[in-house]
């Protein structure tokens, strides 16, 4: 008998779409800001959350230390939760009236398509240093993993003090802002 094999990427993309539909597409109900890089994600996501909150926005936070829905703290196991858990979290945030979600987006989350169909109003790149090479194998693979975030954003904010940031700045096609 003949069997059909689904490529890994197709399977996870389809699963992400299914999870989003199951939860009523919460990723379409809020504005998202994603932060990626080896270091600084937690600091930057918390600063952005504070700025938005001080300007009257209700903000959800997804990160390494904890997830937050307004003032409620929600336990986390991964920097970027797996897609089913992420969509469930988005749904709770939307139900709680969150306007925005600020999230750390890990290289693992990007490669494993944990963020589903999430589109980001802004994506921030902090830096890239040697880390997770046991998973990615090479710095080039690690860079390409981080770069995936910038194919799904309206505006890129990139630290150009970093050599990989300079490269990313030259390669992204969306409107971009340099800092550093």
Question: What does each of the following model-derived ranges do?
Answer:
Residues 15-160, 164-175:
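Phosphate-binding loop of NTP-binding sites
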Residues 1-11:
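Short, small-residue-biased leader/transition segments that mark boundaries at the very start
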Residues 9, 63, 179-180:
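Residues at the C-termini of beta-strands that transition into short coil/loop
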């Amino acid at each position: 008998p003949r069997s059909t094999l689904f490529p890994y990427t197709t399977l996870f993309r389809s699963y992400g779409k299914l999870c989003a539909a199951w939860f009523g597409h919460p990723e379409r109900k809020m504005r998202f800001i994603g932060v990626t890089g080896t270091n600084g994600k937690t600091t930057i996501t918390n600063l952005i959350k504070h700025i938005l909150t001080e300007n009257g926005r209700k903000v959800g936070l997804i990160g390494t230390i904890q997830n937050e829905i307004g003032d409620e703290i929600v336990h986390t196991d991964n920097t970027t939760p797996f897609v089913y858990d992420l969509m469930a979290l988005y749904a709770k945030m939307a139900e709680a009236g969150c306007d925005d979600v600020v999230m750390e987006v890990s290289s693992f989350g990007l490669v494993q398509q944990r963020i589903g169909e999430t589109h980001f109003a802004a994506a921030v790149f902090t830096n890239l240093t040697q880390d997770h090479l046991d998973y990615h194998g090479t710095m080039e693979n690690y860079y390409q993993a981080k770069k995936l975030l910038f194919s799904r954003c309206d505006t890129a904010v990139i630290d150009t003090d970093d050599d990989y940031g300079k490269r990313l700045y030259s390669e992204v096609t969306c409107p971009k802002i340099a800092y550093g």
